């Protein structure tokens, strides 16, 4: 554990931080020789980090593994040994020059395939989004039709007044059912009637009953009053007739006989 911590510290300080600062100085001074030196170092160190990823998994049990790794990093960086320049010129540069065309062709194929795969993934994503939008539109249309049907006259006629309406929203089926009375329905309950025709017949019967009551009730007083007026008129006429009949008739004077001569 201690050797692992020390090796990680050596790799970070001598393998990354110091070469990064030296590369900054080379860029600042614009020294071509330093450019070449540190470019070779970074190529070798990149390969070292790639190999280290696998060796830490499979060869970490090897004795003095971390010590060998620390010594290798110092050997690459030391200005006396110049291990990075040696490895690059003896091994890396000849290998890359031989395999350069194959590597370039692989890179081009990878770019083309990645572009094609990206386009295919984009098309699939657009198709999925379009299908989801269509499904959402159909669900919304179904919910709208359901709400309009809840306010249609046929459904309102089919339901009695005393029973509440249980309406479920198509978009939110898990919500509790809504209890409400449709617009335009009276609040009074009509338990005996089952259809609008029966209700209209009941209303007509009620109107006839009220008309009969009015005939037998309040209008009878008006009839009595009219009858009393007629009776009073008849009485007045009889009185006039009686007064006319009771007037004394003027007696006719007897005709005087002429004197006889």
UniProtKB/Swiss-Prot annotation:
It is found in: Endoplasmic reticulum membrane. During gastrulation, expressed on the dorsal side of the embryo and then in the neural plate and neural tube. At tailbud stages, expressed in the somites, neural tube and otic vesicle. GO terms for cellular component: cytoplasmic microtubule; endoplasmic reticulum; endoplasmic reticulum membrane; endoplasmic reticulum tubular network. Keywords: Cell cycle, Cell division, Endoplasmic reticulum, Membrane, Microtubule, Mitosis, Transmembrane, Transmembrane helix. One of its GO terms (molecular function) is microtubule binding. The chain crosses the membrane at residues 1-21, 35-55. One of its GO terms (biological process) is cell division. It is a multi-pass membrane protein. InterPro entries: TB2_DP1_HVA22. Residues 167-261 are annotated as: Disordered. Residues 221-230 have a biased composition (Polar residues). Belongs to the DP1 family. Inactivation in embryos by antisense morpholino causes paralysis and shortening of the body axis. Microtubule-binding protein required to ensure proper cell division and nuclear envelope reassembly by sequestering the endoplasmic reticulum away from chromosomes during mitosis. Probably acts by clearing the endoplasmic reticulum membrane from metaphase chromosomes. May play a role in the maintenance of both the nervous system and the musculature. Interacts with microtubules. This is Receptor expression-enhancing protein 4. It comes from Xenopus laevis. The lineage of its organism: Eukaryota, Metazoa, Chordata, Craniata, Vertebrata.
């Amino acid at each position: 554990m201690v050797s692992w911590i020390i090796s990680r510290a050596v790799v970070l300080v001598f393998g990354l931080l110091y070469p990064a600062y030296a590369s900054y100085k080379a860029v600042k001074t614009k020294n071509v020789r330093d450019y070449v030196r540190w470019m070779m170092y970074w190529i070798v160190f990149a390969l070292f980090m790639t190999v280290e990823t696998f060796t830490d998994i499979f060869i970490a049990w090897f004795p003095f593994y971390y010590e060998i790794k620390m010594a290798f990093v110092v050997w690459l960086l030391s200005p006396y040994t110049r291990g990075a320049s040696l490895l690059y010129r003896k091994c890396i540069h000849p290998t890359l020059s031989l395999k350069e065309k194959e590597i370039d062709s692989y890179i081009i194929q990878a770019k083309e395939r990645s572009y094609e795969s990206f386009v295919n993934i984009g098309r699939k994503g657009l198709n999925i989004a379009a299908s989801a939008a269509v499904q959402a539109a159909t669900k919304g249309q179904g919910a709208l039709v359901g709400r309009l049907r809840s306010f249609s006259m046929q459904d309102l006629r089919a339901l009695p007044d005393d029973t509440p309406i249980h309406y479920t929203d198509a978009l939110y089926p898990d919500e509790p059912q809504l209890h409400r009375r449709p617009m335009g329905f009276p609040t009074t309950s009509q338990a005996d009637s089952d259809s609008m025709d029966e209700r209209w017949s009941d209303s007509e019967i009620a109107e006839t009953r009220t008309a009969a009551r009015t005939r037998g009730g309040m209008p009878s007083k008006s009839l009595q009053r009219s009858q009393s007026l007629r009776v009073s008129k008849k009485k007045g006429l009889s009185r006039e007739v009686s007064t006319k009949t009771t007037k004394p008739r003027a007696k006719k004077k007897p005709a005087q006989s002429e004197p006889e001569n």
